[in-house]
Amino acid sequence: MFKINSPLKVIVGFNKKKQKNVEFLLNLNNFRNTFYRVLNNAKVQYKIDIQGQLEGVEKLKRCVMIYTVFKGDNRRFDIGNIASIHQKFFEDAFVEYGYLPDDKYTNIPMVLYRFGGISKDNPRVEIEVFNLDDEYEVKRFKDLTKDTIDTFYKERKRKK
């Protein structure tokens, strides 16, 4: 298992008039409404941003991934709105760098999105990758997902 810290936004250009960087927020709303060239710049920059974190990672044949969103503020949001774009960009980069043969369902049969909390100092999406060909990692994944579900139900009962 390894973990990647993915930024919630990437720099896609520079505004000369305002003398500041142009940022692209990695979420589905922006993805849907943005010009394709800007999207391509965002995807390229994302790959560059995570490349250093992938050094030393073993090549995999099959894996499962957990995307945990840590927001920088208390505003409510849709987890899938943020995590889906991180999933798209990360899995494409993971395949392009040669760590996985393909990102189809036979190589990544399960993906889990979850909320990690508020992190004002370090908003991010943590991506955990578990090798399905390693029994120890499969057990860790099972334990982690069981703990996540147990925590959800305990909180739900407490609120009733």
Model-inferred region functions:
Residues 1-160:
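Catalytic phosphate/metal-binding cores of nucleic-acid and nucleotide-processing enzymes, i.e., regions
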